[in-house]
Amino acid sequence: MQTYLVGGAVRDYLLGLPVKDRDWVVVGADAQTMLAQGFQPVGKDFPVFLHPKTHEEYALARTERKTAKGYAGFSFHADKDVTLEQDLMRRDLTINAMAQDADGKIIDPFGGQRDLAAGILRHVSPAFAEDPVRILRAARFAARYGFEIAEETIKLMRQMVENGEADALVAERVWQELAKGLMEKNPRKMIEMLRECGALQVLLPEVDALFGVPQRADYHPEIDSGIHTLMTLQRAADMGLSLPERYAALLHDLGKAKTPPDILPRHHGHDINGVEPVREVNQRLRAPRQCAELAELVCRWHIIFHQVGQLKSQTILNVLKKTDAFRRPERFQTALNVCIADTQGRLNREHTPYPQRAHWLALLEAANQADSGKIAAECRAQGKAHFIAEQIDRARLAQIAPLQKAFRGA
């Protein structure tokens, strides 16, 4: 019985990165051997055990065989006769198919160290094509490390998409990988790689449809709506924004793909036109509520947020109410963060100031100075409870108006 550190722990060690989770593979053992040594079985689908002291995962070396479409269509064979190299061969990428023995020696039968040094993501074997999740994983690793995907691997990924493997992906797995990719250092790279292999058209056709749609050069020197979306997403990442904010950045301009060709490169109403596509993506991916709600909010209101200097006080109050800013100020603030990414996610506009954010927050704070509780009590005391909402609005407008006048005159 021999144990080896495998996968991501070896990869990150060689990259000089912190090793977060350590996974082990056991060669020359079976389930009875593991149980006899005090290991606790935890794997439902595979023979995986927890170490009795460290509680790290130890898996028996295994081989896999494709039995049906999709990521779950596999059977496996785990026994004492399965070698380390056979176990490593079933893994997705060469950089993930390395092991380290107890003496610190690296076992690298497929050139993972070479590809790490070159910044290349390359599939280990044709078996890569048996699991469609690997399309997403390869794109996600590109986003994490900034690596390029080998041309032969991109070609294989294209074939997988053409063969319908991406169609077999369930929403939960797509969201899981997408969410991880969005939180990587370079999420733009993930979307680019998915587009290059054709998977974006299958998984996020609403985003894919943005590429090639022109915008006004005076507002968007990058011209292409898809490129702007990538730049906005990357700016959100560079700002250190949260997953809901990055997801909203990815979907904020879906309405531009709905613009009638005869009015291009203008996009009147793309904020409103984008709401339905955003909802469709949310439903298809089963996006978490916080992500889904923020994406829809940003899509619908980002143009109004940008144009605050042109708005009347009554319109501002209406926006604050419709966006639920009084009850959910934190969400309102995150929406404005995405608007910064939208403004700066343009060619040579990375450092464009965005005073609108501070002004919107100041307007909200001013409107909150109106004592709604006191107003409600006074109305009830006068037998005019039906005037409560109207009186609160008047008090809020009285706070908003001078602030807005000063901002517009600045």
Curated annotation (Swiss-Prot):
Q: Please explain the role this protein plays, according to its UniProt record.
A: Catalyzes the addition and repair of the essential 3'-terminal CCA sequence in tRNAs without using a nucleic acid template. Adds these three nucleotides in the order of C, C, and A to the tRNA nucleotide-73, using CTP and ATP as substrates and producing inorganic pyrophosphate. tRNA 3'-terminal CCA addition is required both for tRNA processing and repair. Also involved in tRNA surveillance by mediating tandem CCA addition to generate a CCACCA at the 3' terminus of unstable tRNAs. While stable tRNAs receive only 3'-terminal CCA, unstable tRNAs are marked with CCACCA and rapidly degraded.
Q: Which gene encodes it?
A: cca
Q: Quaternary structure?
A: Monomer. Can also form homodimers and oligomers.
Lineage top rank: taxon: Bacteria
Q: Enumerate the residues binding CTP.
A: 8, 11, 91, 137, 140
The processes (GO biological process) annotated in the record are: RNA repair; tRNA 3'-terminal CCA addition
* Signal peptide range in chain numbering: none
* Species, as recorded: Neisseria gonorrhoeae (strain NCCP11945)
- What's this protein's name? Multifunctional CCA protein
| Family as reported in the entry's similarity comment | Belongs to the tRNA nucleotidyltransferase/poly(A) polymerase family. Bacterial CCA-adding enzyme type 1 subfamily.
NCBIfam families associated with the record:
PRK10885.1
Domain remarks in the Swiss-Prot or TrEMBL record: Comprises two domains: an N-terminal domain containing the nucleotidyltransferase activity and a C-terminal HD domain associated with both phosphodiesterase and phosphatase activities.
Mention any additional remark.
A single active site specifically recognizes both ATP and CTP and is responsible for their addition.
A Gene Ontology molecular function term of the record: magnesium ion binding
- HD domain residues are 225-326
Query: Which cofactor does the UniProt annotation name?
Result: Mg(2+); Ni(2+)
Residues annotated as coiled-coil are none
| Annotated catalysed reactions | a tRNA precursor + 2 CTP + ATP = a tRNA with a 3' CCA end + 3 diphosphate; a tRNA with a 3' CCA end + 2 CTP + ATP = a tRNA with a 3' CCACCA end + 3 diphosphate
Tell me its EC number(s), please.
2.7.7.72, 3.1.3.-, 3.1.4.-
